[in-house]
């Protein structure tokens, strides 16, 4: 073996160093004699190789060379041979266990394989225990056989005897075949090899032994070369080369401020004289154990063996060691006073380690890790004398060593107190060291008690729902360090709740806060701290425990849309979640909509696999917008109190700025009360003129109302689109201010034009009305032939058409900002229609040339026909129904009641309730035709001309002609007929009128029609004409009226009238027709 690096150093020095060396040599010799006496008493005469503790440790009365059974509690040994030989070869592959039953006879040894199998079952029991459920695998293995873990699994460790519990003997060190040392002697013992051990065990132990050898070889020892006698063999131990000071530390443990040295040594090793002819075998680990226990300076009686890699066993080449190394290995830190004399300590250690071999030994002796000579067999006669000399030298040596470093030794009770305090502080070393290096600079508070959690229910006061600081010197503290370091960089020792803005202190240990932290991809308030977590930019946010619990009415928040309360009582307090806790608990379909186009990203009943998936960015399949769509602003989703349930955003609504080329401008906008339905009468031209809607932000809704109006001013930010909305409002106000003078000028011009047009209309009406009246009264009795009636009617209608065309041109000039009016019927079509209405009963057989008025009159006269004699009342009753577009049966009109008709036009409604006006008073219904005509005329004069009303499409003329009307008549009337326009539609009350009023034409038409009383010619076509009464027009007449219908609504007429008493309207119609019949 190569000599140590310090073995060739010269021993020359001053006289003081030589004196210390001599004293240490004498002390070493006395210790060797003491150990030799102990082993000589316990070694049996048979010379069997066995461990020192096992010589007297026979179980069940079995001697040192006996056998015992494996004490596996289940009784089923994992090996074929259940017997364990009490020798070094067998015990090297065994584990020793202890039973708390003093009278246990099951045994104390298990096979290593059996013990590992049994230990795995105990670990499963520990894992199932509630208190250890949060431990890691490393923690369970570390604390299984300690007091902390064994208390949890004690019941699962029942002994085979049935009266006690087993536990692993942590103090027992199994012997190793490679640790056997042959002493220099006769050499008649056989060589121990590894062949008796299994290869698997060697592989398991290889790594541990290799590390142990590396640590031992790095240490500075005092041994020189190996001397080999002629016929003797000296197997070298793997644990050689360590100094005695490394494995037997001074019991005067050095603690900070105690004034004691730290293993600087009153013990050094050098060779000892002995009997070269004697032989024996000694195990190194056993020697180390008993040398510590039998040391007279070990007042506490503790096993002060150093662990591998510790400060004392890592080598003695340098006396200065970092405090972190000492603390991490469980050793006690070096005194600061001792660090003041580094040069003196190095000289002293070098002098203690350099031990030249004296000539009195006669040969070079091998030294093991304890610095003991391999020749330990000394004559028993010399042992007592050497023991007395050793005690005297040690008593004299203590003051000498104390004076070397100027330290004062402590009494035994003080040593015990210091060791106990050091053990108690070992748990806190890790946390204190981490706290000092986490960059927090001590700005966080230390929690004194847990009284703040008394507000929680008793069922939540446990370690599962409140994060508690773990005990032990283990890690797994990344979350705490992440939070504290992030807050320390921002110099924040307290945070604010995101909901109630209550300040919360941050503590340096779990629970870190009286609430919970979470990371959100959106900054909910200005108090959220921007952090980097796993390469993502997130915001550290906090919620207090009162808001999480939600038991207080002032802290509860509800969803704005479904009004479901948010409950965070299931979250763990005092720690941090790596996702947005509000987004992870969606309550309704509004949470799954895109932030841009408001379309559903997933089905409302569908849920993601993990809570953190809701905080990740996704791409909308409709608008291709990539965003964290499931994370919504808190002010947008939640409210403290909601009086009414707010409407949801429709899926078809466009964003605030509608993209070009889309049809989003024609969509409806929902208000606070609900979204209006689309009307069938609206046209594309009207929708194209409407400005683009703003569905994302409604200025009428106070988005700051739900969350802490007074407590949390920073959180009450406006809606995400509020700023954009405000900018648009400002721009609109500026444009309006600029356009106000122009609009005022235009309004004044329009008013002057309207006044002029009204005057012209009144003059034309006064000029035209006498002509018509004279024509009506003077010519009607004289005209008896049909041809003259047709010519007179043609002249009247031609004049009417000319006046109508002139007025239309004037209106187009005045109303240049409105849509062009629809084209009216041509003169040819109008004359054809009027000529068709004057035909005799022979022409009435043709349905293609019939009209609504002819059908009405024919239906009235058809009561005298032979085909209708079975139904004498059918003609008058259905004539009234045909006039008002509904049947007089029990089905009634859509807006009437019973069999009474109504004047309310249900199909022509455009939603403008303010345009309704009474056609006549309910109590003063017209009783004759003159009263009806006068009422129409007075109503027309009261109308403000040229009212700007949105343009309407032509629709059913009958007040009740709609697709929703129903009829129960047996004549085959179909609901589709009600969609046809007819001439009986009454114009609206607020619409724009033409100069020639409609009631004048109505009078001309009635006065110039000749009704034939010949019933014989109408019998063939009575049934066909009767079927057309209900629809007010036949199929061909409806198509003709579409092109030339002078009785439809004006271009800008209003669409709704107030409902009038049905009885008055029916009576007026009957009186009208009675007057008409009397005229003939």
Swiss-Prot record:
Biased composition (Polar residues): 181-197, 232-251, 663-688, 900-913
Composition skew (Gly residues), residue ranges: 218-228
Tissue expression from the record: Expressed in all imaginal cells of the embryo and larvae. Expressed in a subset of tracheal fusion cells from stage 14 to the end of embryogenesis in metameres 2-9, lateral trunk and ventral anastomoses.
Region described as Disordered: 1-27, 181-277, 310-335, 655-693, 798-826, 891-916, 940-974
Function description: Required for imaginal cell differentiation, may be involved in hormonal responsiveness during metamorphosis. Involved in an inhibitory signaling mechanism to determine the number of cells that will form unicellular sprouts in the trachea. Regulated by transcription factor esg. The longer hdc protein is completely functional and the shorter protein carries some function.
Main location: cytoplasm
Keyword Cytoplasm: yes
Keyword vocabulary terms for this entry: Cytoplasm, Developmental protein
GO BP term, pick one: autophagic cell death
Naturally occurring in which organism (per UniProt): Drosophila melanogaster
Disulphides: none
Gene name, Swiss-Prot/TrEMBL: heca
Subcellular location per the Swiss-Prot or TrEMBL entry: Cytoplasm
Protein name, as recorded: Headcase protein
Amino acid composition bias (Low complexity), ranges on this chain: 263-277, 801-826, 941-974
Other comments on record: Readthrough of the terminator UAA occurs between codons for Ala-650 and His-652. Readthrough is not always suppressed as the shorter protein is more abundant.
Cellular component terms per the entry's GO annotation: axon; cytoplasm; dendrite; perinuclear region of cytoplasm
């Amino acid at each position: 073996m190569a000599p140590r690096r310090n073995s060739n150093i010269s021993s020359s020095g001053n006289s003081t160093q030589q004196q210390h060396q001599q004293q240490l040599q004498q002390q070493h010799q006395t210790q060797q004699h003491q150990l030799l006496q102990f082993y000589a008493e316990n070694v049996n005469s048979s010379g069997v190789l066995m461990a020192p503790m096992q010589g007297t440790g026979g179980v069940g009365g079995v001697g040192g060379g006996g056998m015992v059974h494996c004490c596996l509690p289940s009784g089923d040994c994992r090996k074929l041979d259940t017997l364990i030989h009490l020798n070094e070869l067998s015990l090297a592959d065994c584990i020793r266990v202890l039973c708390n039953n003093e009278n246990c006879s099951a045994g104390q040894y298990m096979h290593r394989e059996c013990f590992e199998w049994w230990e795995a079952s105990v670990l499963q029991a520990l894992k199932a225990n509630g208190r250890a459920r949060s431990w890691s695998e490393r923690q369970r293995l570390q604390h299984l056989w300690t007091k902390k873990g064994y208390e949890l699994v004690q019941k699962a460790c029942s002994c085979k005897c049935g009266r006690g519990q087993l536990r692993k003997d942590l103090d027992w060190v199994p012997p190793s075949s490679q640790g056997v040392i042959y002493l220099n002697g006769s050499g008649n013992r056989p060589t121990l090899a590894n062949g008796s051990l299994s290869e698997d065990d060697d592989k398991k132990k290889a790594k541990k032994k290799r590390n142990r050898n590396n640590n031992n070889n790095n240490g500075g020892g005092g041994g020189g070369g190996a001397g080999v006698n002629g016929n003797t063999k000296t197997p070298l131990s793997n644990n050689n080369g360590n100094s005695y000071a490394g494995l037997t530390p001074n019991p005067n443990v050095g603690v900070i401020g105690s004034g004691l040295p730290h293993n600087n040594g009153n013990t050094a090793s050098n060779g000892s004289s002995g009997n070269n002819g004697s032989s024996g075998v000694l195990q190194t680990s056993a020697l180390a154990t008993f040398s510590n226990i039998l040391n007279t300076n070990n007042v506490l009686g503790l096993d002060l063996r150093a662990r591998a890699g510790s400060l004392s066993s890592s080598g003695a080449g340098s006396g200065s060691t970092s405090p972190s190394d000492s603390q991490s290995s469980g050793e006690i830190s070096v005194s600061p006073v001792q660090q003041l004399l580094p040069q003196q300590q190095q000289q002293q250690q070098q002098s203690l380690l350099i031990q030249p071999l004296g000539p009195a030994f006669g040969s070079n002796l091998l030294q093991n890790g304890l610095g003991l000579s391999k020749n330990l067999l000394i004559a028993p006669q010399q042992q007592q004398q050497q023991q007395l000399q050793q005690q005297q030298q040690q008593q004299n040596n203590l003051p000498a060593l104390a004076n070397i470093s100027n330290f004062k030794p402590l009494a035994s009770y003080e040593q015990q107190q210091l060791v106990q305090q050091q053990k108690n502080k070992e748990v806190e070393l890790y946390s204190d060291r981490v706290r000092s290096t986490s960059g927090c600079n001590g700005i966080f508070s230390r929690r004194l008690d847990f009284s703040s959690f008394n507000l929680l229910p008793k069922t939540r006061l446990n370690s599962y729902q409140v994060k508690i600081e773990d005990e032990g010197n283990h890690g797994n503290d990344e979350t705490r360090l992440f939070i504290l370091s992030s807050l320390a960089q921002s110099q924040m020792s307290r945070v604010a709740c995101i909901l109630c803005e209550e300040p919360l202190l941050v503590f340096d240990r779990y629970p870190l806060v009286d609430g919970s932290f979470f990371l959100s991809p959106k900054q909910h308030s200005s108090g959220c701290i921007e952090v980097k977590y796993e390469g993502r930019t997130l915001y550290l946010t906090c919620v207090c425990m009162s808001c999480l619990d939600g038991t207080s009415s002032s802290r509860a928040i509800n969803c704005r849309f479904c009004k479901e309360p948010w409950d965070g009582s299931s979250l763990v307090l005092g720690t941090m979640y790596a996702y947005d806790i509000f987004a992870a608990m969606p309550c309704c379909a509004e949470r799954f909509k895109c932030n841009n186009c408001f379309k559903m990203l997933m089905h409302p009943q569908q849920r993601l696999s993990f809570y953190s998936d809701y905080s990740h960015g996704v791409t909308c399949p409709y608008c291709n917008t990539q965003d964290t769509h499931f994370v919504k602003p808190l002010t947008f989703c939640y409210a403290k109190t909601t009086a009414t349930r707010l409407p949801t955003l429709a899926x078809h609504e466009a964003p605030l700025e509608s993209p070009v080329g889309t049809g989003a401008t024609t969509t409806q906008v929902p208000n606070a009360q609900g979204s209006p339905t689309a009307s069938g009468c609206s046209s594309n031209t009207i929708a194209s003129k409407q400005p683009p809607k703003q569905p994302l932000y409604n200025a009428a809704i106070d988005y700051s109302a739900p969350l802490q109006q007074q407590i949390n001013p920073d959180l009450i930010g406006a809606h995400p689109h509020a700023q954009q909305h405000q900018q648009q409002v400002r721009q609109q106000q500026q444009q309006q201010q600029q356009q106000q003078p122009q609009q005022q000028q235009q309004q004044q011009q329009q008013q002057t034009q309207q006044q002029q047009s009204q005057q012209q209309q009144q003059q034309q009406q006064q000029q035209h009305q006498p002509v018509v009246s004279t024509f009506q009264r003077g010519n009607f009795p004289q005209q008896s032939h049909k041809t003259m009636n047709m010519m007179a009617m043609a002249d009247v209608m031609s004049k009417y058409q000319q006046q109508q065309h002139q007025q239309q041109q004037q209106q187009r000039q005045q109303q240049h900002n409105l849509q062009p009016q629809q084209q009216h019927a041509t003169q040819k079509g109008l004359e054809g229609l009027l000529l068709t209405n004057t035909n005799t009963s022979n022409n009435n057989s043709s349905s293609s040339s019939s009209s609504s008025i002819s059908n009405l009159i024919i239906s009235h006269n058809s009561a005298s026909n032979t085909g209708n004699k079975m139904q004498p009342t059918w003609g008058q009753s259905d004539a009234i129904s045909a006039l008002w577009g509904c049947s007089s049966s029990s089905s009634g009109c859509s807006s009437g009641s019973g069999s009474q008709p109504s004047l309310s036009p249900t199909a022509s409604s455009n939603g403008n309730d303010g345009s309704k006006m009474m056609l006549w008073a309910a109590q003063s219904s017209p009783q004759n035709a003159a009263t009806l005509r006068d009422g129409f005329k007075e109503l027309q004069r009261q109308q403000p001309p040229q009212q700007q009303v949105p343009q309407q499409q032509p629709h059913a003329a009958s007040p009740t002609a709609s697709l929703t009307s129903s009829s129960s008549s047996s004549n085959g009337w179909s609901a589709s007929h009600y969609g046809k326009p007819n001439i009986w539609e009454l114009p609206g009350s607020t619409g724009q009128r033409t100069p020639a009023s409609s009631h004048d034409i109505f009078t001309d038409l009635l006065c110039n029609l000749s009704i034939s009383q010949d019933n014989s010619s109408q019998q063939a076509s009575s049934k066909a004409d009767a079927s057309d009464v209900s629809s007010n027009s036949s199929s061909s007449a409806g198509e003709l009226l579409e092109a030339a219908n002078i009785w439809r609504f004006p271009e800008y007429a209003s669409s709704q009238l107030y409902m009038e008493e049905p009885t008055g309207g029916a009576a007026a119609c009957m009186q009208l027709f009675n007057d008409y019949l009397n005229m003939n």
